[in-house]
Amino acid sequence: LEDAVSYAEHANNYNIWKYFRDEFPNPYTIEKAKEYIGNICDTNQKTYLAISLHDIVIGDIHVAQQTDILKLSGFLGYWLAEEFWGKGIMTEAVRVFTKYIFDNSEVIRIFARVFSNNVGSMKVLEKAGYIQEGYFKNAIIKEGKIYDQLQYAKLKST
């Protein structure tokens, strides 16, 4: 329960939500946090981790392994409480978690997709060794506005 309270407290932030798919709840309630954490625990997901500071959840990071012909690829997602932005925490989390996934799974390629106006996330990925490999014009609609989307990736061999 403590994790759910902390998770909801930090995830319930417009400046986080505005860069996520609409399925990311807004407002982010304790009930939604319990449901999310419960789903991860029920499926024994080892590729979803909470980012904690002094036993308080301040974000999360996950890689969803793709299926079928894309099964060697993983989709990276993450968020961090706004008060911790710009401190290198997420860059280090992405760097370490990427290595963990490469060392402990069959994944050989990890990719992330970023809104074109999310400069902070682009910097995180670039500092963690990800390379921009795609640019999709008019790919996202959020709050009635259309945005481009960038795709970054890192290969196990690099």
Please tell me what each predicted stretch does.
Residues 18, 44-47:
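Amphipathic alpha-helical interaction segments
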Residues 36-39, 139:
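Short, P/G- and charge-enriched loop/turn segments at secondary-structure junctions
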Residues 1-5, 10-14, 48-158:
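Acyl-donor (CoA/ACP) binding surface of acyl/acetyltransferases
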Residues 39-45, 130:
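Short loop/turn motifs at secondary-structure junctions and domain boundaries
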Residues 13-16, 25, 42, 157:
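Residue-level marker of structural boundaries
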Residues 15-37:
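Conserved GNAT-fold acetyl-CoA-binding loop/helix
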